[in-house]
Amino acid sequence: EGHAIGIHTWSHTPGFPMLRSGAMAAGILRCRESLREITGVETDLFRPPYGVTNPMVARAVKRTGSRCVGWSIRSLDTLRQRSREAVARRIRRRLGDGKVILLHDDRPGAERLLAMVLNDLQRGGYRTATVCELFKTEKP
């Protein structure tokens, strides 16, 4: 359906950036293995919690053979006081070729927000792509 699946750690602990690289790598690999067992999908895509990177994260990414994926548009959809319309407007103002939009699927109304964003992209003449397409690679 045009999706690429990646991992985001096993536990999403707020202290993730402060862990030792070995502990980070263990969480990445545990999540990767669970995903493979459940879906059959092998992935090397990884987004660190909160988008925080540092030398320890870089070591864990290298150790696990992962590719770190960030974003170029932070939607701020996790802020409770923001309406879907305000989030969509923020994204619209920042659109451009090759942009990666950060959205969360566990928020109330996430499906409606995604529909709004996709409509805005279509109206703006943009097309969606997976991060694999942006990386120009076939591997999910």
Regions found by a protein language model. Give the residues of each.
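C-terminal domain-boundary segment and adjacent tail
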Residues: 109-140
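Metal-dependent polysaccharide deacetylase catalytic core of the NodB/CE4 family, i.e.
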Residues: 1-102, 106
